[in-house]
Amino acid sequence: MTRPLCAPKAQLTGIKAVLFDAYGTLFDVYSVALLAEQLFPGQGQSLSILWRDKQIEYSRLLTASRKGPQREPLYQPFWEITRAGLRYACKRLQLNLSSELEERLMNQYRHLSAFPENREVLQALRDRGLRTGILSNGDPAMLDVAVKSAGLGELLDHVISVDSVRKYKTDPEAYALGERATGLPASQIAFVSSNAWDALAATWYGYATIWVNRQNIPFEELGTEPAYTGSTLRAALDALSPA
C-alpha cells in the first residue's frame, strides 16, 4: 500500500521554541506570478518558478564555493541573488526585462503574500507558551519589510537572518543561528519549512522538523525524514498539540 505523502507521525515533545522558514513557508514565493503574468502574458507561472529555482541555486552555489588561491568564501545578500535570479529567468525565457519592469517585480517580491493561516498558527503557538521566530536566508531588510507587510511582528520573538554568518542554508552555521538566538539546543526547537531540502538539512542538523508539504510531493530520498508532515502551516499545531 502506498503511504500518503502527507502522513503525519508521532507528536513532538520537549519543544520550547518554533522557528519557521520564511520564503515558501510563511510567504508565498509564487504569489509574484500574478504580476509576472500581467507583465509577460502567458509566462507568469514559468517565470515565477524559474526565478525561485535560480534564487535557491545561487544561494547554494555561493555557500559551497570558494574563490581564488586563498579559497575566499563567497557571499551576496539574498536581495542581490533574488535580483540575479530574476534577470537570469527573463533571459532564459527570452523576456524583455526593462529597468522599470525589474523594479516592479522586485518590489512585489519584497511584499509577497502571506499564507492565510499564519496569524492563527503563530498566535496559537504563543498561547501555548512557545517562543516563535523566523530563521531565513532573507537578509534583514527583506525580512523586516515582509514581516511588517504581513503584520506578524508582534507574533514573533525572533527574526533571524543568515546574513550574520554570510552562509546560506543548508550550511550548518546557518541552522546554528537558531540555537544561538533562542539559547536552546536544537532538540528543543521545532523547525518548520515547506522546502523539502530545508527540512531535510534541518533534520540532519538536529532540529525536530515539521515539513509543510503544500504541493503534496514526495520527500527527498536520502534516508532521512522529517519528524512530522502536514499540508499547511497548521501542521505545527498538530505536531505540538498537548497530549
Name each region found by the language model.
Residues 6-56:
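Active-site neighborhood of HAD-like aspartate-dependent phosphohydrolases
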Residues 2-15, 123, 135, 139-140, ...:
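Asp-based, Mg2+/Mn2+-dependent phosphohydrolase catalytic module
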Residues 40-44, 92-97, 151-155, 183-184:
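Short helix-capping segments at alpha-helix termini
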Residues 32, 47, 101, 152-155:
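Hydrophobic side chains within well-formed alpha-helices
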Residues 45, 53, 58-103:
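A metal-dependent, Asp-based hydrolase signature
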Residues 34-35, 50, 84-88, 104, ...:
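Alpha-helical elements of Rossmann-like donor-binding domains used by nucleotide-donor carbohydrate transfer enzymes
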Residues 75, 79-80, 95-133, 144, ...:
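Short, acidic loop-to-helix structural element flanking the phosphoryl-transfer center
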Residues 36, 51-55, 82, 105-109, ...:
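Hydrophobic alpha-helical core bundles mediating ligand binding, dimerization, or RNAP-core interactions
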